[in-house]
Amino acid sequence: GQLIDIHGGGKDLKFPHHENEVAQSYAVNDHGLANYWMHNGMLNLDGGKMSKSLGNTVWAKDIIAEKGSNVIRWLLLSVRYRDTLNYSDETMKAAETELQKIYTPWKQAIIKSAMANAELGTEVDSEHFEKFMEAMRDDMNTPNAYAEIFEVTKLLNQSLRVREVDWALVGKWVATLDKMLDVLGIVF
């Protein structure tokens, strides 16, 4: 068969499952199965292993119905993909709180600019966006990418809390946040 670009799975499948797939591919095709192998960390529930056999599973569709896709996506991306993630009421609440800290000034910028009849620009701050992308290129280092999102959120907050608002600057921070969040699949 053809070589595929990316093959992924849980890090618990690395040996023997994925190593067997590589061996089988070489035996049949004289080449490996994939250019890149990505092994994700495990998802724990309240500090313990989540498993169908243990009967302690949580369904994504139920979480999305209750909390929305942005919150679960934010939580899932809050750790590096290779690290273990603990799902609990506390971690979900933390994800909601963090997203709200970004959403509130973002929404204020939209509302206040409309009230001031000011148009927000679409220029993205290249320096902050590049720092965000550097983190993403560093083996999807989402914790560092999140730090850059919070830095831009802080700058947006500061630009809204002055007597004479510079709407072009506000627009730049909003556009930068939009572009960063779009990379993560989060849309306000």
Regions found by a protein language model. Name each.
Residues V28-H31, I64-A65, Y81-F188:
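Feature 926 captures the class I aminoacyl-tRNA synthetase adenylation module centered on the KMSKS loop
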Residues G1-I110:
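Alpha-helical recognition segments enriched in aromatics with Gly/Pro capping
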